[in-house]
Amino acid sequence: MPTINQLVRKGRKSHKGKSKSPALGYVYNTFKKEEIKTPSPQKRGVATRVGTMTPKKPNSALRKYARVRLSNLIEVTAYIPGIGHNLQEHSVVLIRGGRVKDLPGVRYHIIRGTLDTAGVEGRMQSRSKYGAKKPKNKK
């Protein structure tokens, strides 16, 4: 514990918070070959690997994921939400931040219904989260 005199001389340092999705915080300048700190809400990337992984201890499933090389040359692991997907290697995807609690190392989600990613078929509720179109009304 510091003395009053030490606090008067130095004071307390405030800690800066750490980003939960650091890959979204950089833009790569190809001309200067340097990274610029510019946060963005989403990033485009190319899927380099698509597969399944098993979750942490109390849960059991085969969760779909994709390894994505982003436009800023950082490679991340992103979760593919929803039932069924059409992604394969070299698919162009859009990712957003947001971790998957039971998959270690997965800090990003792929946005369904944009670029090469199709929306979830037959989805009626929470359609906007899964890129599903509004169904046609039959009369």
From Swiss-Prot:
InterPro entries membership: NA-bd_OB-fold, Ribosomal_uS12, Ribosomal_uS12_bac
Sorted keywords for this record are: Methylation, Ribonucleoprotein, Ribosomal protein, RNA-binding, rRNA-binding, tRNA-binding
Q: Name one GO biological process term.
A: translation
Q: Is the keyword GTP-binding assigned to this protein?
A: no
| One MF term in the entry's GO annotations | tRNA binding
Pull one GO CC term from this UniProt entry.
small ribosomal subunit
**What Pfam families is this protein classified in?**
Ribosom_S12_S23 (PF00164)
Enumerate the residue ranges of region (Disordered): 1-22, 37-57
Record-annotated membrane-spanning stretches? none
Q: Which residues fall in a compositionally biased region of kind Basic residues?
A: 9-19
Sites of 3-methylthioaspartic acid modification: D102
Q: Which domain of life is it from?
A: Bacteria
Q: Which HAMAP family match?
A: Ribosomal_uS12_B
Q: Which PANTHER family match?
A: 30S RIBOSOMAL PROTEIN S12 FAMILY MEMBER
Query: What role does it play?
Result: With S4 and S5 plays an important role in translational accuracy. Interacts with and stabilizes bases of the 16S rRNA that are involved in tRNA selection in the A site and with the mRNA backbone. Located at the interface of the 30S and 50S subunits, it traverses the body of the 30S subunit contacting proteins on the other side and probably holding the rRNA structure together. The combined cluster of proteins S8, S12 and S17 appears to hold together the shoulder and platform of the 30S subunit.
Name of this chain's protein = Small ribosomal subunit protein uS12
